[in-house]
């Protein structure tokens, strides 16, 4: 390990999910009006199930919490509402806890066709809540975090990006035709991510091993592996299965 990231090996996905959820629970107990940074995808689903359990057991309340999601598609057809990240969050977390839906924010309305918006205003909105107290991230095979693909700049802010061909192809299974797959998304930038007070990265799946190794062995940011931006932060935990 060549950096000050805290790498924690877990024996199972269940253990990884519980440990990550406990980090969130600790933050929320200490600060009931915590500002949470949330991600979509299969990796954090177990974490959200654990947070729902903690809420049901009256261990924590999300009533005063605020959330900001990492990313969202843009230019999606209305018929695919169930493919939006907003739908995912409502389905897998928000509808099962007591968070105020008015306090759950996304970088864009997925159905928006206006590609010339001030996307950086999302950063200002986060700043207006004094920043994210804790942020969960997943990681892509190529080391992307959010939709910050290889080549992303360390000082990047929330912005619209073109999805890679491999991402479009991977997503096509959720759509009737590849033509319906969104070509663009809006993502928090690397500098937006690094402003979070605590970052928890969950690494699930053998296909992520190369990216995990790149992060473990990095002393400084390498734009070929966007995840290495995390070496510039002093409060990062990485949970991985080994």
UniProtKB/Swiss-Prot annotation:
Belongs to the glucosamine/galactosamine-6-phosphate isomerase family. NagB subfamily. Coiled coil: none annotated. The gene is nagB. Keywords: Carbohydrate metabolism, Hydrolase. It comes from Malacoplasma penetrans (strain HF-2) (Mycoplasma penetrans). This is Glucosamine-6-phosphate deaminase. The keyword Metal-binding does not apply. Catalyzes the reversible isomerization-deamination of glucosamine 6-phosphate (GlcN6P) to form fructose 6-phosphate (Fru6P) and ammonium ion. It comes from the Bacteria. InterPro entries: Glc/Gal-6P_isomerase, Glucosamine6P_isomerase, Glucosamine6P_isomerase_CS, NagB/RpiA_transferase-like. The active site is at residues 71, 142, 144, 149. GO terms for molecular function: glucosamine-6-phosphate deaminase activity; identical protein binding. The lineage of its organism: Bacteria, Bacillati, Mycoplasmatota, Mycoplasmoidales, Mycoplasmoidaceae. Pathway: Amino-sugar metabolism; N-acetylneuraminate degradation; D-fructose 6-phosphate from N-acetylneuraminate: step 5/5. One of its GO terms (biological process) is glucosamine catabolic process. One of its GO terms (cellular component) is cytoplasm. Its EC number is 3.5.99.6. It catalyses: alpha-D-glucosamine 6-phosphate + H2O = beta-D-fructose 6-phosphate + NH4(+). It is an enzyme of class 3 (hydrolase).
């Amino acid at each position: 390990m060549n950096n000050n990231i805290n790498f924690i090996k877990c024996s199972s996905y269940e253990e990884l999910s519980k440990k990550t959820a406990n980090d969130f629970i600790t933050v929320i107990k200490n600060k009931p009006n915590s500002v949470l940074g949330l991600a979509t995808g299969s990796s954090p689903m177990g974490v959200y199930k654990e947070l729902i359990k903690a809420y049901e057991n009256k261990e924590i309340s999300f009533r005063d919490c605020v959330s900001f999601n990492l990313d969202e598609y843009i230019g999606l057809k209305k018929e695919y509402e169930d493919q939006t990240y907003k739908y995912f969050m409502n389905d897998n977390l928000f509808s099962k806890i007591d968070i105020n839906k008015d306090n759950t924010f996304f970088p864009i309305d997925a159905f928006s066709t206006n590609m010339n918006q001030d996307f950086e205003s999302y950063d200002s909105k986060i700043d207006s809540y004094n920043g994210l107290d804790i942020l969960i991230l997943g990681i892509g095979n190529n080391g992307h975090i959010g939709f910050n693909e290889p080549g992303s700049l360390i000082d990047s802010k929330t912005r619209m990006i073109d999805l890679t061909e491999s991402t479009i192809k991977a997503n096509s299974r959720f759509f009737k035709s590849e033509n319906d797959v969104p070509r663009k998304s809006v993502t928090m930038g690397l500098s937006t991510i690094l402003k979070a007070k605590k970052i928890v990265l969950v690494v699930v799946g053998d296909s992520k091993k190369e990216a995990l190794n790149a992060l473990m062995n990095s002393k400084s940011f390498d734009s070929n592996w966007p995840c290495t931006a995390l070496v510039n932060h002093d409060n990062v935990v990485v949970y991985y299965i080994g």
